[in-house]
Amino acid sequence: MSENLIGYIDDQGNIIDTQSAGENCTARPIEFDNSEKSLEIIRHSTAHLMAQAIKELYPDAQFFVGPVVDEGFYYDFRVNEKIGEEDLKTIEKKMKELIKKKYKIEKYEISKDEALKKFANDDLKQAVLSRIPDETVSIYKQGDFEDLCRGPHVPALRFLHNFKLTRVAGAYLGGDENAEMLTRIYGIAFADKESLKSYLKMMEEAKKRDHRKIGTEMELFMFNEESGAGLPFWMPQGAKLRYKLEQILHKAHLVRDYEPVRGPEILKADMWRTSGHYACYGENMYLTEIDGQEYGIKPMNCIGHIQIFKQTQKSYRDLPVKYYEYGVVHRHEKSGVLHGLLRVREFTQDDAHIFCAPEQIASEVLEVVEFVDSVMKLFEFEYTMEISTKPEKAIGDDEVWETATQGLKDALKGNDLPYTIDEGGGAFYGPKIDIKITDAIGRKWQCGTIQVDFNLPERFDVEYVAEDNSRKRPVMLHRAILGSFERFIGILTEHYAGEFPFFIAPTQVIFVPISEGHAGYAYGLKKKLMLEGIDSEVSDKNDSLNKRIRTAEKQRVPYVVIIGDEEVQNNTVAIRNRRTREQYNLTQDEFMVELTKQLQEGKI
């Protein structure tokens, strides 16, 4: 057995650790490195190492769950003392001491009844056991520490040298906002020191780019806890940025033969029952009663588009029919997962639904992929695609799901477009392609999606007249390019660190007259630019020239234009170009040509 062997992958893509595999395992080996599967094992084991250290430092600690997550790992636990960020170094030190003891990580199994007796005085373990349907449970042990766990884990602590505990948070037991608040510590781990250093450097840069910090500095958006968590307010600068983004997408939809529509934001609950949302998504919906009838505020836009499609009879000649809407939706996200614009309870999707014949699936999916590609290139994002398959909670039979999933695979394979598979990650009504983008500092984000749906047309009896005059069901493609305006703007803000491209910058030009006598010239230029669709302002408040320039720089305005005697006399402008960091003078006409050229860069 190789010294670097830490597990195996079976034919279904499941990880088997060395403790579970046996000596003659024929599955594909997982070596100790920074591959996805290897990191999953390393990070899960580091979570247990952290728990062991916490137990030694705080003997009264009781542990709930410690999973691997996108940003590393965490453990939820109960402890009598308050643990803060300042305690993380002490816990890390203890973890390093434990590694030096060279403990192996061992696994044994007992019956669920035995486990209930073993952990009879630990209500958190009782809660974990209540969620396990199996009659046998596994326990992993290192030194004197042991914990309920299904694995996978590395063979020994010697693999866990490269880690960092990143933050302390609170977390409700089981995610239930009415339950007890536990302590949660997050961490990260890698196979080597250099990868850890690179990650920590990226996280330092991420702090500087935090969209919540930049959004406050640039006065883009705000939140008000008195009004409700997860409900953003768009301030004038943010609303201008958002409007520009909406307009770019609006024109791009029209040239691709989409038709704008709009549906109500609240529908009778029976509609959501028919669609399956009530049963499969009801816990995320806001429900209310009006005139004795139950209604649901929409969490998705698809039902409205179905009603519009059904309003008039459609022929095969009409297909594909493509509707798009900037649809406001509401979803009940738990307070613990809310995060600035990236996770909110009210948001606007750039949502579209394509009704097409089955034989049109591949061409329509490819057209959407082309649309995605043009948007991502515009904003300098690299991206990958992931096909997500049938989840546990789903509507429709397996055969329909298989047909839909294969349709997505065929569309991408047939055009040599690479993709990965996310087993069980689909929407409840159909498989999907998720668009994963990579930002300027290497972080990955899930944004757009393309979903194939045979189920909702069946449930709502959607039909079109075929060439032979028979009635047939269309296929429904759900798609969003950005995902939501809120999330995408949050990501854009961090991607560009607030230095937005000229064509979407909230204020694109700000004129700073040196004295009151120069203000008239500045306002004349502002009007000229505004008529050409260029957002401009005049900063003529009763502040010093330097303060007004600093304010414009803080707002990251692409062009700061100083107006003095020379500019007024010669009909010129003195420019400070934020992107190039250059200062230069142009005539009014030359300046207009430069701005118009940059404005044109925002077309897709």
UniProtKB/Swiss-Prot annotation:
GO terms for molecular function: ATP binding; metal ion binding; threonine-tRNA ligase activity; tRNA binding. It comes from the Bacteria. Pfam families: HGTP_anticodon, tRNA-synt_2b, tRNA_SAD. Its EC number is 6.1.1.3. Gene3D superfamilies: 3.30.54.20, Anticodon-binding domain, Bira Bifunctional Protein, Domain 2, Threonyl-trna Synthetase, Chain A, domain 2. CDD domains: ThrRS_anticodon (cd00860), ThrRS_core (cd00771). GO terms for biological process: threonyl-tRNA aminoacylation. Its cofactor is Zn(2+). SMART domains: tRNA_SAD. Residues 210-501 are annotated as: Catalytic. It catalyses: tRNA(Thr) + L-threonine + ATP = L-threonyl-tRNA(Thr) + AMP + diphosphate + H(+). Catalyzes the attachment of threonine to tRNA(Thr) in a two-step reaction: L-threonine is first activated by ATP to form Thr-AMP and then transferred to the acceptor end of tRNA(Thr). Also edits incorrectly charged L-seryl-tRNA(Thr). This is Threonine--tRNA ligase. It comes from Sulfurovum sp. (strain NBC37-1). The gene is thrS.
